[in-house]
Amino acid sequence: IKLSKKSKIFIYGTGVLKSWNINIVGNKDEVEDNFRQDSNLLTGCVTFFGIEIYDIEISSINNMCEDAINLLNVKGFIRDINIINSHFDGLDIDFSNLEIQNINIENSGNDCLDISSSILEIDTFYSNNCVDKSLSIGEKSTVKITTFESLQSNIAVAVKDSSNVTISNKLGIENDMLSLIHI
């Protein structure tokens, strides 16, 4: 799916979204100052809302919204998420309960992964060149990550608001400032 200026995708409904491969391509030259949220207060170039998903793959390249991908009140299993060149946050997960096999995020203008009020199990998380945080966890979230790698970000992991994170294997944590902060 090719997104043009001011276009967004909103995926919602009953039932299960199963075995889909979703590829979103934006235009990094079409940044608009007031595009951080739309008239429905949606912040994602692609927003999944209130659905169950199983065995899907999502990729996003050159998307300029507040969140390249936003998972809001979603449950299920995601095989792969790949995000390259997001103007602000790469992936925003709110109020969700998910198992994710692989997350790869590169070149985010803010946080690579922002998690709020969610329960997540992530097998492999890799990020490179996140301007702010590689991984931000807040609002009573519980996150388990088997393998974590963060390169060239300001902060590798920030945990706040009574949230918990467990990281089993830490590989290649090379960032500008802090490796782990807890607020």
Give residue spans per PLM region.
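Extracellular beta-rich repeat passengers
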Residues: 1-182
